[in-house]
Amino acid sequence: MARTAKTLTFVIPAYNMESYLDRCVSSLLSATNTDDIEVLVVDDGSQDGTLEMAQKFEARYPGIVRAIHQENKGHGGAVNTGIAAANGMYVKVVDADDWVDPESLEQVMTVLREEADSTEPIDMLVTNYVYDKVGKRNKHVVNFRHAMKAGERLTWNDLGHFGLAEYILMHALTYRTAVVRESGMQLPEHTFYVDFIYAYQPFPWVKTMKYLDTPFYHYFIGRDGQSVQTDVMIRRVDQLRLVNRCMVRATPECDTVPDGLYRYMIHFLAIESSVASVFMILSRDPENYEKKKDMWDDIKAYSPTIYKDVRKKAMSRALNLRGSIGRFVIRKGYFVAEHVVGFN
């Protein structure tokens, strides 16, 4: 496969991120050799100094950093723009308030350069990520040691068992750029939680992957108004439903893809469906209880097989307990998980 000049493109969707962008971009430029790294800062119609800061980085690092300005399209629209503009053989999305670990960056670049020079480069690299929550001393590191053997070329059928709360999020993913484009993924604009789609729709086009057991990505939690705060997610349950609908329609039938891929996609779809259900229940709003029912009815109408397989999952069964008892179980279960994991 022909070697491109850029090994890795980082896409940074940025809206009003003037206070955080310097930390993010600086971490991406901490590599010993940045010649084959590309950093695209997609300013999504910011109202602060985000664009000006991105342009300063572009002037300071010509040929490496590029500032892209667009009218506001939301997180998904900014990711779409970045992927379309990417020149790297591989692409990774880094939110502007997050950052990467410098030592892990060196390891990642070593692996990707080797793959870029090979005749059959992997389609996806999976790395660990850290929930970096404000005020929490012990940071929760998400790894995939139980499901993936580190350092080896893997296919979907080589993967082990993913536990109830184990899944591959955007923070863990580096895709081969061509794979994302071939998948035809276009994230919904002006919609939150499209990260679920990003870590799902391209997977049927991924044939080979590697797992690097290093804490590459730091996921910052604690910024006011952040989309993963409980009250915010409750207000945005309609967007969680939209994301669920997109994921359902990106799910292949079981006889069209490797067994390992189908099992994982059902596992992750069950988790997203469960997350959406949790926040509909946490709202204590009867209208949202009805929306929860409508969401599950939509899955069943689209594919009875996918619906049956998703409902088999333990978390999904628990979330579909009827009446006030079921709602009580979910409310209590969420807050226990929140305390242990530091998700929110």
Model-derived features: positions:
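Short aromatic/hydrophobic "clamp" motif used to bind/position activated sugar donors
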Residues: 91
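Nucleotide-sugar-dependent glycosyltransferase catalytic core
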Residues: 191, 208-243, 283-290
